[in-house]
Amino acid sequence: HFYHLGAVYDLEASAEAMEKANITGTKGALEFAEAVNAGCFHLVSSIAAAGLYRGTFTEDMFEEAEELEHPYHRTKHDSEAMVRANGRIPFRVYRPGAVLGHSQTGFIDKIDGPYYFFKALQKLRESWPRSIPLVGIEGGYINVVPVDFVVDALVHLSHQPKLDGRCFHLTDPKVRRVGETLNVFARAAHAPEMAFRLDPKVFAMVPEPVTQSVQRSKPIQNVFNQLLRDLQVPRSVLQFVNYPTRFDSTATQKILDKAKIRVPALEDYAWRLWDYWERHLDPDLSIDRSLRGAVKGKVVMITGG
């Protein structure tokens, strides 16, 4: 068995970095696997290989991917295409959803998906009374899975006979929207929830000239960009808030069910993810709050008699 997990999953990474890791790296891994006569090449791809497909993307779909303009989507799709077209070595492809921390410990060494909004939830908890309802957006679809499920599923599937050439969605069969998912984490964080969530279709009713005028407004853009910086939300993440794709994992679930490997309910372990993030990954933990840290890199004028 040869497992290839090396990739760039950072949405903020440059297109060149993604090309080098996701495409050039996969090419090198394939060549090495052939050189050592590996029995099967196991590619850990991503649901990103579907691009921004509108509808339900099944495990036997690949070429149907749509809107691969973002380099992350494109390089994940292209690396998968390379493995499929190789023809000289058996392969299996695994497409995990957005990978979260361990469902039993909360441990994670890289943030993805909902983690980008944890700082915003934390600030809301500190400044907004839970008794006052919030209005938010329902958003598109989001599929999240804990890392321990991904590992258990990968190990089991890779050792089952007669599955070469297949693709497996390591995803949550429960369909969730972004707004619903953020509310789960809001409860875990003891932050106010979005009592009212607006469907994205509501904004489609706004006349296009009005939308374009707002988007081009320099003052509005400046305020919006400052808000993103304060909440530490990468701008690139926002394009996925209305993610249009649902993922079907029926075939994979049938295999995993026999081994009693199932995706745990997010509600059951979200508190562990939040607790671990707040104790270990919160960016504010690394801020130097001493006098030295407060004045470092600044020009300070001391006045007085």
Name the predicted role of every residue range.
Residues V300-G304:
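Conserved N-terminal Rossmann-fold NAD(P)-binding element of oxidoreductases
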Residues H156-R235, K254:
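Mid/C-terminal beta-alpha module of Rossmann-like enzyme folds, strongest
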Residues Y3-G6, E12-K20, T24-P71, F91-R92, ...:
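Conserved Rossmann-fold NAD(P)-dependent oxidoreductase catalytic core, especially the SDR/UDP-sugar
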Residues V99-Q104, L134-Y141, R166-R176, V184-R187, ...:
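Glycine-rich Rossmann NAD(P)(H)-binding loop
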Residues G55-T56, E69, R84-I142, V147-D152, ...:
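NAD(P)-dependent short-chain dehydrogenase/reductase
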Residues S236-V299:
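Amphipathic terminal alpha-helices
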Residues I23-A29, T75-V83, F117, V150:
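Conserved catalytic Lys-bearing alpha helix of Rossmann-like short-chain dehydrogenase/reductases
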